[in-house]
Amino acid sequence: MRAPAPKEPVTEDLDPAADPYAAYAALRAKGPVHRVRAPGTGDSWLVVTHEAVRAALTDPRLRNDIRHSANWETDGGHAIGRNMLQSDPPQHTRLRRLVAGHFAPGRIAGLRPRMEAVARELLAQLPERGTTDLVSGYALPLPVTVICEVLGVPVADRAAFHTWSNELVMPTSEEAAAGSAGALTGYLTELIAEKTRSPDDSLLATLATTTGDASAGPLPGPGAGGLMPEELLGMAFLLLVAGHETTVNLISATLHSLLAHPDQLARLRADPSLTGGAVEESLRYNSPVHAGAFRFAAEPLDLAGTRIGAGDAVLVSLAAASRDPLAFPDPDRFDITRRPRGHLGFGHGPHHCLGAPLARAEATIALRLLLDRYPFLAFATDPADLTWRTSTLLRGLRELPLRLGRPGGRDSRGPPA
């Protein structure tokens, strides 16, 4: 998506492929809000302090609906259907209410046995010793399998689905992104039609059978209950893509941080009850979502002392906020015993990540079972040589080559022979 251009010259360049945290620190030292231009986007305002980010995420004058952008007719990007991420109350409230119960902590607890079974199946396919890529062999297929099972995506279609999804969230080119958007739209349209004709117990079938009547006019109001066809398409797209992309990054980034800090890995092995804390610290320290979706000023407003024009794009940096020293002492230190309350890894406010309980459960299970199976883990290459998939909004490892020790319990010791 191309964001609208502010009325004054750009003052900063934002390169997501570079070291983002050094760039965020430099910007924070200058102030909470900056004009930036990132590759593939137009000019926008970037919010980088914890206080200002929290304020922006709850400011009703900053809207998610692209139609509040000064250039909304040409800057729609490759959105598929209408979804929660690009809507505002009351539409957002209604859409979120329709699926919130399916991602509540109690519902996710019921999925934990299946998550553990999938994780164990994947671990059994990894070599007993030697090297492997943790992303392709474990961090990716675990959340893909889980969300596809929840929504009812057939096994045979999952590889293609992920290829399209990956191209949309981290595009290699405008043409490739457009092609993936078209392919995924066609696929989801056919899948929804199939779920409507032959409902099963999947979430997508449940949503499909509550679709509203497109001939009834505009969006039904809160409490109407149904989804319009375009909303159902957007909901399927958002749940499938958001339901796995960030979790892949979370699992791999958490292990990366642990391997880069051997003292923390040793502490976790000695006390597995810290696994949840390790995931929370990873969300703060190396957030898989570096920025929330673009917001657009519905009217002129003041944000942390900066004047924002109507129609201007605002980008809130969750990653920068979670490294703010005013909110987190010694923020560049990875500490799994930290209690990082207030981290913004899953956002804040009305658009706080609906799938947070699912992502937390998947990451915690993935980490616990991996460490339990392998008493020795180490980088298989120089960490400095690892490449990160980056976009304005997301950041995650492309691959994570590891050296594996012999599978066994926690009493096993020693590196691979």
List each language-model region with its residue ranges:
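Cytochrome P450
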Residues: M1-A417
